[in-house]
Structures are given as C-alpha cells and as structure tokens.
C-alpha cells in the first residue's frame, strides 16, 4: 500500500502518524492492499480556494476527499486486473484543524487522526448528508479511531517492555563467565 504525504501547510505535523492511521483504516476496511492514497496538507488560504472551487462554499474547511471512483459505502477499489488502484486524495488543513482541536480539548495530532479516518471513509463512499448516513459514518469513524488508538497504545507498551528486557539482559551479561 502506497501512501504519499505532501505537507504544504507550513505547520509541522507527524506525517508518520497520518500514514499509520490511514493505513490502519484501509486495512480494516478490506481495501485492496495495492491501493494508493495521496494526502496533501494545505494552509487556510489554499484550502479556502479549494473549498470554494469544489464545494462552492466560502472559507477553509478541515478536510476534503477526492475519490478516484464513486464507491458504495463499504465498497472497495478492488479490481480483477493486477496493479495498484488509486483510492484518491485527502486534503487536510492543519491550521483549521488546530482551532477545532482547541475547541474540542484535544491535540492537533488527535484531530488530524480523526480527520484522516473521516477522509478515508469518504473515499470509500461513506457520507453524512442524511441523518442515517451521518449516524452510520460517525459510529464507524469513532470505532476505527478507537481501535487505531488501542493498537498504538499496545505497540507503545510492547516497545517499552522490549526496552526494559533489553536493558535487563545487558546488565545480566556482566555476570556471564567466559
């Protein structure tokens, strides 16, 4: 799976975290592992321009998704022929997201992870224009984000334990006899 990130926002963000959450969602949603995804991070002026051009709405927004193909909710871009398929583009605005994060009482990284999940779900055909669609999409979004966070916490604790084990083994070598 290829995920390309281009940060043109001027704000330092963890690109590896964005890739991690996108890769997790794509895997959990059974998308073809050869799928390609592009993520672009823009400043508010560029996002406002994109928002007006594509949605005819003034001002910036947090995330926009541009699927390569129209997909049904839960659908996949699997194709019978070999080769990668282009899932689409997710455009994020970290500056706008930072304001939302502050209002919600969490970090920019947490907000961008949420928006990445949201963007991938849009690429897979999910929408929230109608109340029933919103309920389904937001429940799935919450579930996927919680699972990804749990996986990150587990990996962190495993890394910590491995580091403790390594230090303990290093200390025990002092007592080894030749």
UniProtKB/Swiss-Prot annotation:
One family name in Pfam for this protein: YbeY
Enzyme class: hydrolase
Entry's Gene Ontology BP terms: rRNA processing
Coarse class of the protein's main subcellular location: cytoplasm
E.C. code: 3.1.-.-
Disulfide feature: none
GO molecular function: metalloendopeptidase activity; RNA endonuclease activity; zinc ion binding
Gene Ontology cellular component annotations, sorted alphabetically: cytoplasm
Cofactor entry: Zn(2+)
Residues that coordinate or bind Zn(2+): 118, 122, 128
Co-factor note (free text): Binds 1 zinc ion.
PROSITE patterns xref list: UPF0054
Keywords: Cytoplasm, Endonuclease, Hydrolase, Metal-binding, Nuclease, Ribosome biogenesis, rRNA processing, Zinc
Record function comment: Single strand-specific metallo-endoribonuclease involved in late-stage 70S ribosome quality control and in maturation of the 3' terminus of the 16S rRNA.
HAMAP family registered for this protein in UniProt: Endoribonucl_YbeY (MF_00009)
Family membership noted in the UniProt record: Belongs to the endoribonuclease YbeY family.
The protein's name in its UniProt record: Endoribonuclease YbeY
Gene name linked to the record: ybeY
């Amino acid at each position: 799976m290829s995920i390309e990130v281009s940060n043109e926002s001027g704000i330092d963000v963890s690109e590896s975290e964005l890739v991690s959450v996108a890769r997790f969602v794509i895997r959990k949603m059974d998308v073809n592992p050869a799928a390609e995804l592009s993520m672009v991070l823009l400043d508010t002026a560029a996002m406002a321009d994109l928002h007006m051009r594509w949605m005819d709405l003034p001002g910036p927004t947090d995330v926009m998704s541009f699927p390569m193909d129209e997909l049904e909710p839960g659908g996949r871009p699997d194709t019978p022929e070999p080769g990668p398929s282009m899932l689409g583009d997710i455009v994020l605005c970290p500056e706008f997201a930072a304001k939302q994060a502050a209002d919600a009482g969490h970090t920019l990284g947490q907000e961008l992870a949420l928006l990445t999940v949201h963007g991938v779900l849009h690429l897979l055909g999910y929408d929230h224009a109608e109340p029933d669609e919103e309920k389904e999409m937001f429940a799935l979004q919450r579930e996927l984000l919680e699972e990804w966070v749990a996986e990150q916490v587990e990996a962190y604790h495993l890394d910590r334990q491995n580091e403790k084990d390594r230090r303990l083994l290093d200390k025990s070598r002092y007592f080894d006899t030749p």
